[in-house]
Amino acid sequence: YQLIQFFHSGKKNKEPVFKALQLAKDKAAIYPYLIQYSIIANDKTLLAEYAQKLYAASPLTPNVYEYQYNTLMSANTNAVIYARGIGDLVGLAMVQQATNIRKDITLKYYEEGMDLEPNAYLCLSLGREVIAKYPNAYYTGLLVSLNPAGDFTELSNHISNDFKKERLDYAVA
């Protein structure tokens, strides 16, 4: 019930999610929602705490870790990455906060009609309908950049210099 209240608040009311944590037998099951709340509320302390707790309780598989790592590496310095799901936003926060990867990046919860910050990137998981609203966007690896005047240089640099490819190499071997 508490999580439903949290969802109905647009994931902006902290009382129901903290009540759900208090009542839960499996605290780690509530951590993803606390991570989402902390990103929406821009609470970096809470984000670090619960991303690290979730990572300790339920580490990402090597394939998922590499995907999330490469997603973070698809952005330039001091980027803002917009996502909105448990599968993308929470995984990115876990890798970033628990392993200190790309702490220069700000993670944001994407909402329709919001003003996007400069140096903005969208997660592919936002879907075609959202990405299509930005006709000048371009792929940078596992993200879409909204920065003007992009070309394939950024994509090429990320793939050649920044990406981990161990799991990909393993998959084709």
For each predicted feature, which ranges?
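Short His-Asn-centered micro-motif
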Residues: 82-86
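ER/secretory pathway lumenal C-terminal domains and tails of membrane proteins involved
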Residues: 1-70, 74-77, 97-173
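A short acidic (Asp/Glu
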Residues: 89-97
